[in-house]
Amino acid sequence: MADKEFDFVAFDACLMGSVEIADCMEGRAGYVIASPELEPQDGYDYSWMTALGDSLPSDMEWGEAVGRSMVDAYDAYYASGTAPVAMSLMDMKEYPAFHEVFHQYVDGIPQELREELYRELGKDRMKMLAFGSRQAGGSPELVDVLEFLDACQSVYPDESALQTLKEGMGKLVTDQWAKGYPGNPSGLTIYLPSGSNPYLSEDLETYDTTGFCSAYRQLTDGYAAYLARESGVEWGNINAHKDGTVEISIAPEDVSDVTGAYLAVFCPVGDDGNYYLLCTDSDVDIGVDGTLRAAPENSYMGMKGQVLCLIETMNLDAYTEYMAPVLYNGELCTMRIGFDEEHEDGQVLSVTPAGQTSEAAKQIYELKEGDRVTPLYLVEHMEDVEEEPVDGAKDGAKDEAKDGAKDEAKDEAKNEAKD
């Protein structure tokens, strides 16, 4: 690498708008342009290159001029879609100051508070803006930097440090554009381990090689160890009430070990003990007495009269997001659906291939008239549940069986899909 840094470095790739990437590019680029989200299949709109032929504004460096052109072109190209998309421009001369305060804050979290912090991170996970692909039973492992810091504040409040970090973030992310999110992203993501990741230990070994903030890597190691800890919680029987609510009890002393719970609603299929999963819902009240209480929905979203399998991936105060496994024009995909006041019946945000290849990760489809959609269902085999048709308080939906749609569902889905 030459002593002189690049004027700018741009990543026409998915999920590169992270604080870890910023750390890697310190001293190597004056400006970094990257997306914190999955990029649609078309990637960049290269009309931004017109900035290279324009005269440089008197108050702007080349890296900044090109970066702003990239953000504007991305905005114009993807403004009409519904899929969440984002692009950020980082002024790298601001990174050292941001990292210094970030390191000091994370390093200063007392050891005696870390167990409580790990619990809070688990509880707040579904409330954080997350980025990347969503799979059944899993959580994206990239979250908004400022939302992670807000979660830390609930355990280790330091308003002065938080304000300094927010100001530093505003200088570091000098320009950005985002759409399709329930809130306003900060422009940068950060890695936060998920207990649903079967390759967590291997991923952490890789993460340690990035050289990112040593204080944060120590925190993620501790959080991962917490996630991997065997649960000793004994779950009681499920009780269904006439008002529709269901309850399950645990020992009061075990309440602090439960960071979150799901109500999972199943529908019986035939007489062989198989059940289709209809939805998961994290709106579960966890009482200090050890009682977990939830109420199933009265109705569930469907298309052409066929109910979808809705697996919750985000649950904010005024917004809930789900993924639904489907066959989209014959391809195994995940449909992303959001609910808010404006879209009480749900809005299909995007459809993405379920494959794990880099090619699949870059493809984002938008549901359009004429598409063929076949709902798919996760299947659970349960014995002796005739008197308890509703199961709940699960850590998440299992994804061992992605198919199982009824033949009539396939026939229904051959009709035109709704927008």
Give the residues covered by each predicted segment.
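Terminal, contiguous helix-loop blocks that mediate binding/assembly
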Residues: 1-394, 398, 418-419
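Intrinsic-disorder/low-complexity detector
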Residues: 389, 400-401, 405-417
